[in-house]
């Protein structure tokens, strides 16, 4: 099995299964001299865990400590420029909850596809196709964020849920997201209707139901000129990064699919945010707005009631999408340093 690597310059290799001994990442390409912020690493892992800011009633009941162990690549609080390995150990797996899906895969899940493709797979907790795989992405993204803060301090990445099930942010609510503490909302749905969304998800969880939704990522003050002009456009690498996350179903940049309905005189002479901060595959330095849709989670009916599952992945996916964004930014920043002499 291959394809567990991501990146061209800032390269990560992730490993581990949901109910295995540990999950981890090897990072190769992070320059020496970056201040290693262990507090940031722990904070981002905590944000990915179930139960952030009182969200415990609307997410999986699995409680892992996710305490990171840095095995290499850091000394005296700074990166060495050598391969960096970080792991977290699994401590709260309940493999018996998954005995039923060993021979009866969940509808729409990767369970049977992995088994059919490879002939042998780990069904416990979904194995490597589990959402728990994203722990490795968040650890890697934390290091990428450290590097970007070292070279581009003003850059910010803000993720939030813009739609969960039938509930959608208004344009006015969306315009205010950068002023809000997204994590203070149970469902990371920055609206006065956040409790309604939480109630919707709690009801779904109690009834063995699930919901899909949409997450948005806003990149403020990105470095200009990131992205290669043909096969590694910034937008194409961001799309690949997002669509590699489990349960994703669609991707949009800027005006997205709405651009198909707009006349050229409106699109090109209107607000610049229609481009989403990227033109010709290269960042302009303006804010970048990205949107990704998620299908309803596959653990439904009796499987959902017996196990510990999320009724909607969007809430938990926000830190993961932010991490993938930082990875793409770090990768393209290092790449941009070789664009010209």
Swiss-Prot record:
Pfam families in the record: Chorismate_synt
Biological process per Gene Ontology, one example term: chorismate biosynthetic process
Chain intervals for the UniProt region annotation (Disordered): 45-64, 109-134
Obligatory cofactor(s): FMNH2
Entry binding sites for FMN: 128-130, 280, 295-299, 308
InterPro entries: Chorismate_synth, Chorismate_synth_AroC_sf, Chorismate_synthase_CS
Keyword flag NADP: yes
Binding residues for NADP(+): 48
One annotated GO molecular function: FMN binding
TM regions (residue ranges): none
Top class in the EC scheme: lyase
GO cellular component term, pick one: cytosol
EC number(s) recorded for this UniProt protein: 4.2.3.5
PANTHER family: CHORISMATE SYNTHASE
Function recorded in the entry: This reaction introduces a second double bond into the aromatic ring system.
Stated family: Belongs to the chorismate synthase family.
Protein name: Chorismate synthase
Organism annotation: Bdellovibrio bacteriovorus (strain ATCC 15356 / DSM 50701 / NCIMB 9529 / HD100)
């Amino acid at each position: 099995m291959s394809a567990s690597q991501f990146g061209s310059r800032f390269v990560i290799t992730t490993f581990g299964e949901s109910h295995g001994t540990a999950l981890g990442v090897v990072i190769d390409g992070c320059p020496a001299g970056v201040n290693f912020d262990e507090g940031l690493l722990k904070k981002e892992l905590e944000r990915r865990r179930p139960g952030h800011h009182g969200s415990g009633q609307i997410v999986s009941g699995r409680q892992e400590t996710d305490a990171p162990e840095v095995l290499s690549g850091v000394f005296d609080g700074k990166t060495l420029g050598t391969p960096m390995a970080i792991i977290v150990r699994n401590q709260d797996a309940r493999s018996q909850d998954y005995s039923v899906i060993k021979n009866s895969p969940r509808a729409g899940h990767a369970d049977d596809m992995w088994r059919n493709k490879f002939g042998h797979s780990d069904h416990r907790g979904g194995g490597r196709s589990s959402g728990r795989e994203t722990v490795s992405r968040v650890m890697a993204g934390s290091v990428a964020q450290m590097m970007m803060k070292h070279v581009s301090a003003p850059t910010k990445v803000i993720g939030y849920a813009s739609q969960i099930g039938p509930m959608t942010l208004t344009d006015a609510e969306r315009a205010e997201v950068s002023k809000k503490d997204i994590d203070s909302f149970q469902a990371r749905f920055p609206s006065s209707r956040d409790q309604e969304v939480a109630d919707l998800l709690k009801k779904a969880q109690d009834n063995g139901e699930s919901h899909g939704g949409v997450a948005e990522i806003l990149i403020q003050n990105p470095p200009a000129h990131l992205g290669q002009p043909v096969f590694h456009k910034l937008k194409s690498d961001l799309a690949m990064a997002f669509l590699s996350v489990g349960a994703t179903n669609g991707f949009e940049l800027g005006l997205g699919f709405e651009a198909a309905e707009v006349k050229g005189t409106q699109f090109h002479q209107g607000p610049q945010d229609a481009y989403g901060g990227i033109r010709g595959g290269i960042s302009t330095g303006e804010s970048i707005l990205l949107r990704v849709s998620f299908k309803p989670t596959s653990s439904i009916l009796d499987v959902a009631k017996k196990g510990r599952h999320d009724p909607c992945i969007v809430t938990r996916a926000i830190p993961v999408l932010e991490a993938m964004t930082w990875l793409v930014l770090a990768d393209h920043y290092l790449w941009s340093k070789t664009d010209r002499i």
